[in-house]
Amino acid sequence: MSKTHLTTDKFAQMGLEPEVLAGLESKGFHYCTPIQALSLPLLVEGHDLAGQAQTGTGKTLAFLAATFNYLLTHPLTKPRLINQPRAIIMAPTRELAVQIYNDAESMSASTGLKLGLAYGGEGYDKQLAVLEQGVDILIGTTGRIIDYFKSKVIDLSNIQVVVLDEADRMFDLGFIKDIRFLFRRMPPATERLSMLFSATLSLRVQELAYEHMNHPEHVQIEPEQMTGVRIKEELFYPSNEDKMLLLLSLMEEEWPEKAIVFANTKHVCEDVHAWLENDGHRVGLLTGDVPQKKRMKILEDFTKGTVDILVATDVAARGLHIPDVTHVFNYDLPDDAEDYVHRIGRTGRAGKSGHSISLACEDYAFNLPAIEEYIHHPIPVSKYDREALLDDVTAPKRVFRNRQPVNRNMRDRQGGGNSNNRRRPPRKS
């Protein structure tokens, strides 16, 4: 794996406690990413921090290392009840909360500090049993944390560290009232270490930092381009009739090792999933109403490689760290220009290259000007030969459509792709 995304700064130079370093090094982390190198010296000194960094820059490891380090170096000066965690880490989604928890386990093992997890959708009693035993660091979503707080399962009056991850996403999802409710139940900002991370430090995020933090230092990690220099962007203008066949043809030509296909609605995601599955791809579906256990299993399968393609709404566009994604397909151009950046940011991470392919169809092409204005450059356009799209595709039985795909010959972009009408064999299960 390329190390070009790392700095020459080592975690051992950051002033971290030996137990924290042991947890990092047990997972092979020795050198810092830019956000870690900039933020950890400030956090170790006890400064609050508001950091701007995209997902995949190493910010999770930065705030986890700082949290564990602070708790080790600042023992409580008064007795703590068993229902009083010492640190709280808030995330916008269940998947991100679970991911943070998993990333924290190595430092938990090396420091002896106990972790708790709280998120909605499932596992209330199981999570409750852990919390009732007492935890040092509580990681979770705001809604479930408030449920436990109102039930007096947890008490926030002894919080020493608070982390708010993906703050901009919290606003998007309408969780800011919950966040303010929780902040007001904690000790004042001058009596705790506070960290906020966000992909964008918008005015509303800065106001939140000003309101609930103690003169935070601002750290900003700007990509060389809004969309990342390692991501090859490509745009097609298909008709609505050609759109699905073009996606299938591109899948056949690119044959991605690991791809995410984004669509704007649940129903379109289900449609795309059915077509891809019917065409022999190993594909998973991730939308907002997929049951939690199934969501976690799909993400696990996708991460392990037993599923090659994930079809998703924007529920997966932010927060989740899914390594080694080679391709992102925007089947629908997003309505929010910022979501375009978050979507294609799933690839081209950790020093690797990636490929983003967007379809500007009749329904969503009008979103393109705002996207290109936001990213400060036009997306390169590729043409396709509609006579060269796949001609051996049939609609899946469970998808009801007014028209059937028109038989066409071959599938390439101006001469590329497989020759002699050969199809790749279906992916092996």
UniProtKB/Swiss-Prot annotation:
The keyword DNA damage does not apply. InterPro entries: DEAD/DEAH_box_helicase_dom, DEAD_box_RNA_helicase, Helicase_ATP-bd, Helicase_C-like, P-loop_NTPase, RNA-helicase_DEAD-box_CS, RNA_helicase_ATP-dep_RhlB, RNA_helicase_DEAD_Q_motif. One of its GO terms (biological process) is RNA catabolic process. Residues 243-390 form the Helicase C-terminal domain. GO terms for cellular component: cytosol. It catalyses: ATP + H2O = ADP + phosphate + H(+). The keyword Cytoplasm applies. ATP binds at residues 53-60. One of its GO terms (molecular function) is RNA helicase activity. This is ATP-dependent RNA helicase RhlB.
